Amino acid sequence: MLEHCHGEKTHFSRNEKEQILSPYRSFCVNFARPPHPSAWGTPIINRRMNDEYKTIDGIGQGVYTEKRSKFLAYAHPVDSVEQIKDLLAAYRKQHYDARHVCYAYMLGPERQEFRANDDGEPSSTAGKPILGQINSHELTNILVVVVRYYGGVNLGTGGLIVAYRTAAALAIDNAPMVSRLVEETVSFAFPYVMMNGVMRVVKESEARILATNFENTCEIKLSIVRSKAEELRNKLNKLSFG
């Protein structure tokens, strides 16, 4: 189940739970991953080396109207739960007269931190469809908020799901999408006589130099795509025994 910020919980069927866990059973060997929400949209293609992730690079907006109810959707790039809380507070203040401010978010290159919130709508009719759109676009580091202004006519469970899903999709589609690299930091200390060898390895590995210190003991801090980090460490360590 998902536990909402307001104490609300979203329950999933046994079949949904099986789908959530299934993408990782094929290649989890040395470590365990948390349940994945791929059952709520198009399944995510598993990548052994997670060097890239998809996110949005700006705000997207969408509006959907059904039976006089208006759904205003906003997609935001985010990096932390703290930032999400600030944005939610701002939207609740801006739309103080709205009936519901529902949302879902996904965080982290591995898409391991996520939450959905129905904000008083019937269980699983708002937050879950919003999260499904985030997942079907394979996005992370994103918050989607859908504000509902009630039009006086009940939409029913099916109507609510369609409305929140459609509004979320419109906001996401109107946001600029980008792919970003997942990088890891590698630090190495060495005597000055090893300088040429170290710089040769850095160049061959296509690592980025973040910082250097060439005083008594030389130190270098590098950034490299995650899949090449261990290989870089091994090459640098071998220089010490060369």
Question: Which residues fall in each region the model found?
Answer:
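C-terminal regulatory domains involved in ligand/effector binding and gene-expression control
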Residues: 48-125, 229
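A common structural junction motif
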Residues: 95-98, 205-210, 237-242
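Active-site beta-strand/loop microenvironment that shapes enzyme catalytic pockets
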Residues: 126-174
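Short glycine-/aliphatic-rich beta-strand segments at the starts of folded cytosolic domains
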Residues: 177-192
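Short amphipathic alpha-helix segments
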Residues: 189-207
